[in-house]
Amino acid sequence: AGAYVPMYIMTSNINHKDTVTFFEEHHYFGYPKDYVKFFIQEMVPACDHEGRVYMESDTEVAMSPNGNGGWFGSMVSAGLLDDIHARGLEWINVFAVDNCLQRIADPLFIGATIVSGCESGAKVVRKAAPDEKVGVLCTEDGKPSIAEYYEMTQEMATARKENGDLLYGFGVILNYLFSEKKLEQIADARMPIHVVEKKIPHIDLEGNMVKPEQPNGYKFETLVLDMVHMMDDCIPYEVVREREFAPIKNLHGVDSLDTARELLKGCGVTL
């Protein structure tokens, strides 16, 4: 009916220019340019295993993105709150781009969340197996929480209800709906910092660029799952896996380009 959903696209210092250029070259894929805003994710220093900060050049510290939990803070820093307020936005749908079947601004998901009275919602799928590498939506101390697969014990992962279903059986697909008002209330709250071992390019003492083949230090990230835990409640909204979950984590094999292509074809997409 002539209405458009504003899109806020988070980029990095590395890919920002290329991303904007890509949209411009494709004329924003027919979407009104005024409804598309780009912003750069904030960065934090990376260090070695002893806590020494790596250098990217003689004058620049090696930096890394601050994790997917930094999206709202990065929007605020980019001055986009004024745009959000001017448009009268009450809900923000945040999602990961490595799932090519994400259904965004889903009216049923939005409606279910609003009708529930909850201040957030999370799309979930039934886990394909107890050891599937997805975080699961649960409650912790009376508040919504997401337990990452690597944090779960074997006993937790395989626990079942009386009807045989997995006790922790609903995996998140990184598609969340948040009350904009609540996001502003928690904007200044301190989020947990997750220390992640990664491969960090840097220069050595002689000024040579080093691109390690093994993890050589730590990056420091905030995660969107911690934002869910900061909500008073969160409605789990189950979707059909084959219609909305095609993660791309690998080139081939499980959760790969190959499996994503087949799932897209199954949804009627011509490649």
Predicted feature residues:
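Short, active-site-adjacent cap segments at secondary-structure transitions
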Residues: 16-17, 100-102
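Catalytic core of tubulin tyrosine ligase-like
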Residues: 84-93, 101-105, 110-270
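Short acidic donor-binding/metal-coordinating loop in glycosyltransferase active sites
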Residues: 97
